[in-house]
A protein has these predicted regions:
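Intrinsically disordered, low-complexity proline-rich tandem-repeat tracts
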Residues: 15, 25, 29-35
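Surface-exposed, charge/polar-rich loops and edge strands
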Residues: 2-6, 34-434
Length: 434
């Protein structure tokens, strides 16, 4: 395994690289990570983030073991690419760095149902609890759904439409205990581009090994490559490992609109960050270590915390810790006991947090709903390195990746990935951007 510290004579790889060890492609003469003309240009449109991908590149099953997937390493300063396997990841981290994970757990939330009056088949994707006996779901087909429509769920149970909540979602009154029913009869919500039904293997494959809190309707896929051995190697190198929570919501299935990126929004998603996580991240930054974010959901959580710490106005709604739960808390089944609420009474709107002292603001624990949408140009305040997958063209997660590495570098990397046979999307290969 290549040791990145030894490869550069023990020097900080962010400042100097031994180009003689660069086994990949150099994509250009630009050595200044902050000098990316394409990121400073205004008027970017969704079409600027398009690329062609033949169906054969889409991974429909994961590799075994998890860390046998390929790892493309992008160096922003050198504008270069290297090729490894994911098992090599720990060699890129040093003592004093930290890794931040998203420990949300994917629910087996895709259920089949029948309309008793017609016998018509309906597929439901339950995305979040909205209160006692109430869940919000995407419905297919949903054109004829209306208030009072009753569905009989396969395996027992029922779901009755309470109201339409958006163009594609409905609020249902469900029979309890619904979580137990979903665990027994639900399917894992693997993406439709896999062009197959979920099976028993997806119960493990479409879940990170560290998943803890149920609430997501899609996996934080950057974490799927990690194994217990990966964490053992990281800890042996003196790397601290902490977690945030962000439940991936139905907005992950909603494409961005064609045309200008500016002015578009993401649906709110629930997140939490504990005091321990904030302390480790603050300590890492304070001593000059690097913060490695595992995935775009982790990145959005950390950057939301940075906005709050800096007193910036952000699209954020705080969770309320009230006896018996609140509408916000009930949506996700409550929050972490050691998190604090932000934004006073928890009403929808703008939240602020002013950090004490001078210099870079310190992150503080929070829980609530974030609409953080990151696209070029963007000044990252917390994240120094990003672990992510290869994403759909023009998706919000691809835009975040382009904001972090530069649009031209990412598009070049995707072409290099196709040329060298990488596997794309949720069950595909991985990318490390340093």
């Amino acid at each position: 395994m290549l040791d990145r510290r030894n490869a550069s004579g023990g020097k900080d790889l962010r400042l100097e690289r031994d180009t003689g060890l660069n086994a990949g492609a150099n994509l250009g003469p630009n050595s200044d990570a902050d000098s990316r003309p394409e990121d400073t240009a205004s008027g970017l449109t969704l079409e600027d983030f398009h690329y062609e991908l033949p169906q054969d590149f889409i991974a429909r099953r994961p590799l075994t073991p998890r860390d046998s997937s390929r790892l493309m390493v992008l160096d922003r300063a050198a504008q270069s690419i290297e090729h490894f396997t994911f098992g090599s990841l720990p060699s890129y981290l040093e003592e004093g760095d930290c890794v931040v994970l998203n420990d949300t757990k994917v629910m087996p939330c895709r259920l089949q149902a029948t309309r008793p009056e017609t016998g018509g088949k309906v597929e439901l994707l339950f995305v979040r609890r909205r209160g006692a006996c109430q869940w919000e779901a995407l419905v297919r087909p949903g054109r004829k759904m209306k208030e009072g429509t009753l569905l009989v769920l396969h395996g027992g149970g029922s779901a009755e439409v309470v109201e339409r909540t958006s163009a594609s979602t409905f609020l249902f009154r469900v029979s309890e205990p619904f979580e137990e029913y979903m665990e027994s009869w639900g399917e894992m919500p693997i993406p439709p581009y896999m062009k197959r039904h979920a099976d028993a293997g997806d119960r493990d494959d479409y879940q990170t090994v560290y998943a803890k809190t149920p609430g997501s309707c899609a996996a934080p896929t950057a974490g799927l490559h990690f194994t217990r051995e990966t964490f053992q190697k990281l800890e042996a190198r003196g790397v601290e490992i902490v977690k945030v929570l962000l439940h991936v919501g139905p907005g992950t299935f909603k494409p961005l609109k064609p045309g200008p990126i500016a002015g578009q929004t993401l649906d709110p998603e629930y997140f939490e960050a504990t005091a321990e996580t904030c302390q480790v991240v603050n300590r890492t930054r304070g001593r000059g270590g690097r913060v490695f974010a595992v995935g775009t959901t982790t990145t959005r959580s950390l950057e939301t915390l940075a906005d709050l710490a800096a007193g910036a106005e952000v699209a954020f709604r705080a969770s309320v810790a009230a006896e018996g739960g609140s509408a916000a808390a009930a949506d996700v089944g409550g929050g972490a006991a050691d998190s604090t609420s932000v934004g006073g009474d928890g009403a929808a709107g703008v939240a602020k947090r002013v950090a004490p002292g001078d210099g870079a603001p310190s992150l503080e624990p929070a829980k609530g709903w974030t609409e953080k949408f990151i696209y070029p140009p963007y000044d990252f305040k917390v994240v120094d390195a990003l672990i992510t997958n290869f994403h759909l063209p023009g998706s919000s997660v691809m835009l975040l990746t382009c904001a972090f590495a530069g649009r031209e570098l990412i598009l070049s990397a995707y072409e290099e990935a196709k040329r060298t046979g990488y596997r794309f999307y949720s069950y595909g290969d991985s990318m490390l951007i340093i």
